[in-house]
């Protein structure tokens, strides 16, 4: 890896989307298999833009695990830190959507839950310019949670730039929201760049007002905060300056992976920033970074899928 690379650490899994109309999983018969996992999506977004991205995580040494590795390899993500477990299966998620918006969700957790510090190539991690922690599953339980927080602490001690996206999933944290808030705050405390949705901001900060919520995240320890607001754009703050950066109008077909695309686009630019540790003081630069990330996130919504919908730099130029 080169010194301007980004390593994304977390889960890589299979999403099975039920393509039958208005049925629950018990009645569903047809499913579309797709590569998933927020950190993996971020690594793919960076690579498709032409950046250097690596993924670190664990899958099963099974057909699904090989499919996932091949998917990341195809978009030129470095998978040399992807561990394939011979005993645990690849994590699988099954989702169906009814016309009333009700979601049926089953999560079969596998190899990603067993990710430990022993699975990490610390020497390679130390070479990275940015470490991104954006797992929806890492904070759920040990050993993954302890490994995640420990890696963030090591990166902080090394002076590396730390990115964090809590990726709250109600289906996974039902009945354990206070536990989610507690571990998310531990991660935010050591993070340089924190991306949250407006829902996540309210859950973590405990307040509905966006500006007050952002101030709380800064008090916890975040240097740069980006709150995605959907069509309204992104609220950007560095603790001193604060502004809503507008998005671009698009006809949305599928918003899957839009948040991950936003993060990937932001990290792609941050990785190419010379003075990254002081970038939080340059609000003009931050504004440019978020404006570009907004565009990438919006463009992803115009296509089906997560990784397949991610644009290249050339495609962004044509679209805009």
Curated annotation (Swiss-Prot):
Which controlled-vocabulary keywords does the entry list?
Kinase, Transferase
- Stretch forming the signal peptide: none
Q: What class of enzyme is it?
A: transferase
List its EC numbers: 2.7.1.-
Q: Which InterPro entries match?
A: Carboh/pur_kinase_PfkB_CS, PfkB_Carbo_kinase, PfkB_dom, Ribokinase-like
**Name of one Pfam family that matches:** PfkB
Keyword match Lyase: no
Domain of life (superkingdom): Bacteria
| Disulfide-linked positions | none
Q: Which GO terms describe its molecular function?
A: kinase activity
Q: Which family does it belong to?
A: Belongs to the carbohydrate kinase PfkB family.
Descriptive protein name = Uncharacterized sugar kinase YdjE
**UniProt organism field:** Bacillus subtilis (strain 168)
